[in-house]
Regions:
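Phosphate-binding chemistry for phosphorylated carbohydrates and sugar-nucleotides
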Residues: 1-137
Length: 137
Protein backbone atom coordinates (compact mmCIF):
# COMPACT_ATOMS: atom_id res chain seq x y z
CA UNK A 1 0.00 0.00 0.00
CA UNK A 2 2.81 2.44 0.84
CA UNK A 3 4.42 1.83 -2.56
CA UNK A 4 1.12 2.60 -4.29
CA UNK A 5 0.77 5.85 -2.33
CA UNK A 6 4.29 6.90 -3.29
CA UNK A 7 3.38 6.60 -6.98
CA UNK A 8 0.38 8.94 -6.72
CA UNK A 9 1.05 12.21 -8.57
CA UNK A 10 -2.19 13.99 -7.83
CA UNK A 11 -5.38 13.65 -5.82
CA UNK A 12 -8.83 14.93 -6.68
CA UNK A 13 -11.99 15.21 -4.66
CA UNK A 14 -15.44 16.71 -5.12
CA UNK A 15 -18.12 17.94 -2.79
CA UNK A 16 -21.18 15.67 -2.33
CA UNK A 17 -23.07 17.01 -5.35
CA UNK A 18 -19.94 16.94 -7.55
CA UNK A 19 -20.07 20.57 -8.62
CA UNK A 20 -16.71 21.64 -7.13
CA UNK A 21 -13.33 20.02 -7.71
CA UNK A 22 -10.38 20.07 -5.32
CA UNK A 23 -6.95 19.10 -6.65
CA UNK A 24 -3.69 18.34 -4.87
CA UNK A 25 -0.38 17.64 -6.62
CA UNK A 26 2.82 16.06 -5.38
CA UNK A 27 5.41 18.67 -4.46
CA UNK A 28 9.22 18.58 -4.44
CA UNK A 29 9.38 17.34 -0.84
CA UNK A 30 7.18 14.34 -1.61
CA UNK A 31 4.12 15.80 0.09
CA UNK A 32 1.03 17.24 -1.53
CA UNK A 33 0.11 20.84 -2.26
CA UNK A 34 -3.48 21.97 -2.79
CA UNK A 35 -4.04 23.95 -5.98
CA UNK A 36 -6.32 26.97 -5.84
CA UNK A 37 -9.39 27.22 -8.03
CA UNK A 38 -7.53 29.87 -10.01
CA UNK A 39 -4.62 27.51 -10.67
CA UNK A 40 -6.84 24.60 -11.71
CA UNK A 41 -8.98 26.87 -13.90
CA UNK A 42 -5.90 28.29 -15.64
CA UNK A 43 -4.48 24.81 -16.29
CA UNK A 44 -7.75 23.52 -17.75
CA UNK A 45 -8.19 26.66 -19.86
CA UNK A 46 -4.75 26.26 -21.42
CA UNK A 47 -5.25 22.51 -21.93
CA UNK A 48 -8.60 22.98 -23.69
CA UNK A 49 -7.25 25.63 -26.07
CA UNK A 50 -4.19 23.48 -26.89
CA UNK A 51 -6.42 20.48 -27.61
CA UNK A 52 -8.75 22.55 -29.81
CA UNK A 53 -5.80 23.84 -31.81
CA UNK A 54 -4.20 20.40 -32.15
CA UNK A 55 -7.47 18.92 -33.43
CA UNK A 56 -8.14 21.78 -35.85
CA UNK A 57 -11.31 22.82 -33.99
CA UNK A 58 -10.04 26.17 -32.72
CA UNK A 59 -11.75 29.37 -33.81
CA UNK A 60 -10.95 32.96 -32.83
CA UNK A 61 -14.61 33.09 -31.81
CA UNK A 62 -13.96 30.52 -29.06
CA UNK A 63 -14.36 31.98 -25.59
CA UNK A 64 -14.00 31.36 -21.89
CA UNK A 65 -15.96 33.03 -19.08
CA UNK A 66 -14.79 34.01 -15.61
CA UNK A 67 -16.22 36.07 -12.78
CA UNK A 68 -14.61 39.13 -11.25
CA UNK A 69 -13.08 37.21 -8.33
CA UNK A 70 -11.19 34.92 -10.72
CA UNK A 71 -7.56 35.44 -11.66
CA UNK A 72 -6.80 37.53 -14.76
CA UNK A 73 -4.51 34.67 -15.80
CA UNK A 74 -7.50 32.93 -17.42
CA UNK A 75 -8.03 35.98 -19.60
CA UNK A 76 -4.32 36.14 -20.45
CA UNK A 77 -4.35 32.49 -21.52
CA UNK A 78 -7.35 33.10 -23.78
CA UNK A 79 -5.67 36.15 -25.34
CA UNK A 80 -2.43 34.17 -25.78
CA UNK A 81 -4.33 31.55 -27.75
CA UNK A 82 -6.17 34.17 -29.82
CA UNK A 83 -9.54 33.55 -28.19
CA UNK A 84 -12.02 35.71 -26.30
CA UNK A 85 -12.69 35.96 -22.58
CA UNK A 86 -15.71 37.42 -20.87
CA UNK A 87 -14.71 38.57 -17.41
CA UNK A 88 -15.65 40.84 -14.52
CA UNK A 89 -19.04 39.16 -14.27
CA UNK A 90 -20.77 39.11 -10.92
CA UNK A 91 -19.95 36.10 -8.77
CA UNK A 92 -22.03 33.01 -9.44
CA UNK A 93 -22.28 30.46 -12.20
CA UNK A 94 -25.68 31.83 -13.18
CA UNK A 95 -23.79 34.77 -14.71
CA UNK A 96 -21.51 32.42 -16.62
CA UNK A 97 -24.63 30.60 -17.87
CA UNK A 98 -26.21 33.93 -18.81
CA UNK A 99 -23.13 34.82 -20.87
CA UNK A 100 -23.33 31.44 -22.60
CA UNK A 101 -26.93 32.16 -23.56
CA UNK A 102 -26.10 35.68 -24.77
CA UNK A 103 -23.00 34.67 -26.77
CA UNK A 104 -24.21 31.28 -27.95
CA UNK A 105 -22.75 27.95 -26.97
CA UNK A 106 -21.12 26.97 -30.26
CA UNK A 107 -17.81 28.58 -29.29
CA UNK A 108 -18.04 28.24 -25.51
CA UNK A 109 -14.94 26.46 -24.21
CA UNK A 110 -14.80 26.87 -20.45
CA UNK A 111 -16.27 28.67 -17.46
CA UNK A 112 -14.37 29.07 -14.21
CA UNK A 113 -14.57 30.64 -10.77
CA UNK A 114 -11.91 30.81 -8.09
CA UNK A 115 -14.23 28.91 -5.75
CA UNK A 116 -13.23 25.66 -7.54
CA UNK A 117 -16.22 25.71 -9.87
CA UNK A 118 -15.64 24.68 -13.49
CA UNK A 119 -17.69 23.95 -16.61
CA UNK A 120 -16.03 22.51 -19.71
CA UNK A 121 -18.73 22.24 -22.34
CA UNK A 122 -22.19 23.53 -23.08
CA UNK A 123 -24.19 20.47 -21.96
CA UNK A 124 -25.35 22.20 -18.76
CA UNK A 125 -25.37 25.65 -17.14
CA UNK A 126 -23.76 24.92 -13.79
CA UNK A 127 -20.50 23.71 -12.31
CA UNK A 128 -19.46 20.13 -13.10
CA UNK A 129 -16.55 18.65 -11.19
CA UNK A 130 -16.76 15.28 -12.96
CA UNK A 131 -15.80 16.53 -16.41
CA UNK A 132 -13.28 19.00 -14.99
CA UNK A 133 -11.61 16.11 -13.14
CA UNK A 134 -11.12 14.26 -16.43
CA UNK A 135 -9.25 17.22 -17.87
CA UNK A 136 -6.98 17.40 -14.83
CA UNK A 137 -5.97 13.76 -15.24
Amino acid sequence: MVEALLEIHDMQDTDPDADRLGVMVRNSTGGFTALSGNQVGALITDFLFRKRKASGRFSPQDYVVETLVTTPLTREIAVHHGARCFYELLVGFKYIAQTMEEQGTEHFVFGTEESIGFLAGSYCRDKDASVAALYVL
